[in-house]
C-alpha cells in the first residue's frame, strides 16, 4: 500500500486512512488500525484472530515481534540482550499501568490515535508475551508458506533468538 513503509509509519493507521479515502476495500492490520476504522465509522471488525475468530491456526498469524539481524546479534550480543530486556520491562510496565501507553502514544501518533492507544493496549495485554513459542512460530511459518511469502520452511532456531530465552521470563 503506498505510504505504508518507512520509519515512524504505522501500517494500521495508514491502512485506516486509505480505507477512509476509498483507496482500499479492507485491510488486515494491527489493533490500532482496526480501532481507528471502527471508531471513525469507516470500517467494521470482520475477524479478530486473537479472540478466536477464523480458523484456530489464525491465532498464530498475528503477534508483535522485535526483529533484528543475525549479524547484529553476533556482533553485539549485549546490545541485542538489552533490547530484549527493554521489551520485557516495557510489557511489564504496561501491565502495571496501561495509561503509560497514552504518554508514549502522544509522541508517535496523531492526537486522535494517541487518545485510543491505552484502550488498544489494554485489550491486547493478555496476549503480550516477549517470547515466541515453537507452536506460534510453526503456525506463522505454515501461513508464510501457504501465502507464498516464503519458498521453504524455516527452522525455529534460525529465526527466533533462543539464546535470549532466559530473558523472556524476567519481569
Could you describe each region identified by the protein language model?
Residues 74-151:
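Secondary-structure end/capping motifs
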Residues 36-37, 54-56, 123-125, 160-164:
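Short secondary-structure boundary/hinge segments and terminal tails
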Residues 14-107:
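Pocket-lining segment of extracytoplasmic ligand-binding domains
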